[in-house]
């Protein structure tokens, strides 16, 4: 880790601050805004229930276990020693961070991306891309555009969502072959990058 301590944290008194400093800060940053060079996404727009589920999946080998998922294996190692209580505290800590819309990095057709999102993604992720609690589908608004692309490719390539205990990921694996055109994916990601995360 980079030697940064909990002193650099936004809310060092929070129950999840110590684990965030030890396990998350060096890749995801003080404000949870991530680093593209490390393929570490911004976390601040993610729902705490979703964060906790993903951390458990990494810890339990449901996600990040594919031998070709280099970045997922880093998350699996970082999550390995976390208890359910620590995961809940971490999710709460991340949820308390200010939401920041990540900078756009992909040049796509935003208007077409909106149309594609409404036709292909909104049934589960919502027309405003803020997710669907009943379906436990995560928000896509507020995610890094490059992360949306990389995760879609992982679903399509079987690096994510292939584990039988990942019932949500399995749905994405089934749906991912529907979009093979890179321009369409980039347009969707570019559109999502314009949507503010839920406050």
Where in this protein do the model-derived segments appear?
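Conserved hydrophobic/aromatic "anchor" residues
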Residues: 20, 58, 93-94, 117, ...
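Sequence/structural segment immediately N-terminal to covalent heme-attachment motifs in c-type
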Residues: 6-33, 106-130, 199
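Intrinsic, low-complexity N-terminal interaction/targeting segments
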Residues: 22-26, 66, 89-92
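Inter-heme linker and motif-flanking segments adjacent to c-type heme-binding CXXCH motifs
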Residues: 33-35, 64, 96-109, 122-123, ...
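Residue-level hotspots at or immediately adjacent to binding/recognition sites across diverse folds
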Residues: 30, 70-71, 127, 168-171, ...
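C-terminal capping alpha-helices of c-type cytochrome domains
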Residues: 1, 77-102, 174-199
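Gly/Gly-Pro-rich "capping" loops immediately C-terminal to redox-active cysteine motifs
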Residues: 17, 25, 32-63, 72, ...
């Amino acid at each position: 880790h980079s030697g940064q301590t909990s002193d650099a944290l936004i809310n060092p008194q929070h129950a999840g601050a110590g684990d965030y400093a030890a396990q998350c800060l060096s890749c995801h940053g003080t404000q949870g805004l991530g680093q593209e060079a490390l393929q570490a996404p911004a976390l601040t727009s993610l729902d705490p229930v979703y964060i906790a589920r993903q951390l458990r999946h990494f810890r339990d080998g449901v996600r990040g276990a594919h031998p070709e998922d280099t970045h997922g294996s880093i998350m699996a190692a970082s999550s390995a020693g976390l208890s359910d209580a620590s995961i809940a505290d971490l999710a709460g800590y991340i949820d308390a961070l200010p939401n920041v819309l990540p900078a756009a990095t992909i040049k796509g057709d935003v208007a077409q991306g909106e149309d594609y999102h409404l036709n292909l993604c909104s049934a589960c992720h919502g027309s405003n891309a803020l997710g669907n609690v009943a379906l436990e589908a995560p928000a896509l608004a507020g995610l890094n555009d490059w992360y949306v692309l990389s995760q879609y490719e992982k679903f399509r390539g079987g690096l994510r969502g292939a584990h039988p205990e990942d019932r949500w990921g399995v749905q994405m694996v089934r749906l991912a072959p529907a979009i093979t055109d890179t321009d369409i994916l980039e347009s969707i990601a570019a559109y999502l990058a314009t949507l503010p995360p839920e406050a």
